[in-house]
């Protein structure tokens, strides 16, 4: 029988509410060595995901802005000012809302193939519009190794 997402997904996950300040999310990313944090509402409905990249996009000027405004070169403190401005914004202003997800009854191999195709490391697992876990490529690999490599030669 093929392994399902529910067989190997992580049920303990970190999520924040949409009004959580970016500085708190940044602290969680650093403290727990995460690449992203899920954003849910009070009923655990997945609203989005926020990544280091999302925060960087808010913090750094885009290329056109940088080229038009030389003040970033002349006054590097502008980045610090910009950082101070965005750190208190709610995470909903930085998160990605179009999140690729999977379901607990999906085949784990299918979820792994989706992650590989989309170049992402983990997928939120959603059931009945509620976040129930996350699955990573590592979860799938470990699951396969444990299932099919019962005995490893010395």
What would you call each of these model-derived segments?
Residues 1-28, 34, 39-42, 46-47, ...:
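Bateman/CBS regulatory modules and CBS-like beta-alpha motifs in cytosolic regions of diverse proteins
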Residues 34, 38, 46-61, 124, ...:
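Short beta->alpha transition motifs characteristic of CBS
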Residues 120-121:
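Structured functional modules or segments
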Residues 62-72:
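Short, charge-rich, low-complexity interaction segments located
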């Amino acid at each position: 029988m093929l392994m399902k997402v529910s067989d190997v997904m992580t049920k303990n996950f970190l999520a924040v509410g949409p009004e959580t300040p970016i500085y708190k999310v940044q602290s969680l990313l650093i403290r727990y060595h995460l690449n992203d944090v899920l954003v849910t509402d009070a009923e655990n409905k997945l609203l989005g995901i926020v990544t280091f990249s999302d925060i960087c996009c808010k913090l750094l000027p885009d290329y056109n802005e940088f080229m038009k405004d030389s003040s970033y070169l002349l006054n590097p403190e502008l980045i610090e000012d910009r950082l101070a401005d965005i750190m208190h914004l709610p995470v909903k202003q930085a998160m990605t809302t179009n999140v690729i997800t999977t379901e607990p009854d999906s085949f784990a191999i299918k979820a792994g193939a989706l992650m590989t195709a989309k170049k992402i490391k983990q997928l939120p697992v959603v059931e009945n519009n509620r976040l129930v876990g996350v699955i990573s490529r590592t979860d799938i690999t470990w699951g396969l190794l444990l299932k099919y490599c019962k005995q490893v030669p010395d």
